[in-house]
């Protein structure tokens, strides 16, 4: 059964603000976010993805192995009256269920059958939300998802595994209303050097994978409450 939860965007702030600053890393100097665009195979489906961290945005701008410099575009999001789905406030299983809607963690018949049941049990209905916020499932985070559906990870260590990545929280702008509330601060466009920040991106990924493998192979991973037992 799908569940439903609403998180006012302003709750993200330590002070009572209605606007937040977000960054988008891209190879493109000229870029216009467009409602209805994007890839359905991304973590939360079609949408425009941003982060609160300018350093992570710089890494994401040059994460491709093409040796081209990138750009970070700075935006201000007016959160007034926006409905936000925050996966950090929900079970990690709910986040994994959302990934399974859009990305395949395995290509076996067993996975396809179990994934449908998992999504039905732990998924949430995302229609009607203006913004989705949660972990970014890049290579190392998706490594967790793949190992989990292979029954190699106990649920008791899932949240700790996610904390090891340090690879960032993202915002996905979903609705036309949210797009209209997003405004670029064009005078604050930042160039990104490929050699410096691609190396940082790769180093972060290598370190995350090592730490994750170490935890998965440790005694803390009892491999008792695993994917197939949670249905």
Locate each region found by the language model.
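Short aromatic-glycine-(Arg/Gly/Cys) micro-motifs in beta-strand/loop hairpins
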Residues: 9, 17-41
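Short, well-structured alpha-helical interface segments that form or flank functional binding sites
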Residues: 52-55, 70, 140
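A short beta-strand micro-motif
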Residues: 22-25, 71-75
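Extended catalytic/binding region for NAD+/ADP-ribose chemistry, centered on the ART fold
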Residues: 39-64
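Solvent-exposed, flexible loop/coil residues
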Residues: 34, 39, 48, 175-177
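Short, flexible loop/turn elements at secondary-structure junctions
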Residues: 26-27, 48, 54, 77-81
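Conserved NAD+-utilizing ADP-ribose enzyme module
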Residues: 2, 6, 11-18, 42, ...
């Amino acid at each position: 059964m799908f569940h439903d939860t609403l998180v006012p965007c302003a709750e993200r702030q330590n002070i009572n603000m209605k606007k937040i600053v977000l960054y988008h890393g891209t190879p493109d100097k000229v870029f216009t976010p467009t409602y209805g665009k994007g890839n359905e195979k991304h973590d939360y489906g079609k949408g425009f993805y941003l982060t609160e961290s300018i350093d992570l945005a710089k890494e994401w701008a040059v994460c491709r192995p093409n040796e081209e410099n990138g750009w970070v575009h700075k935006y201000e999001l007016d959160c007034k009256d926006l409905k936000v789905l925050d996966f950090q406030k929900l079970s990690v299983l709910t986040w994994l269920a959302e990934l399974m809607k859009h990305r395949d963690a395995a290509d076996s018949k067993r996975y396809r059958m179990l994934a449908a049941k998992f999504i039905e049990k732990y998924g949430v209905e995302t229609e009607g939300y203006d913004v989705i916020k949660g972990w970014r499932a890049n290579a190392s985070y998706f490594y967790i998802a793949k190992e989990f559906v292979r029954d190699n990870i106990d649920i008791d260590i899932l949240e700790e595994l996610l904390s090891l990545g340090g690879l960032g929280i993202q915002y996905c702008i979903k609705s036309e209303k949210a797009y209209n509330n997003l405004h670029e601060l064009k005078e604050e466009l930042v160039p990104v050097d490929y050699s410096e920040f691609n190396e940082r991106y790769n180093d972060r990924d290598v370190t995350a994978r090592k730490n994750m493998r170490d935890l998965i192979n440790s005694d803390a991973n009892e491999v008792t409450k695993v994917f197939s037992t949670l249905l």
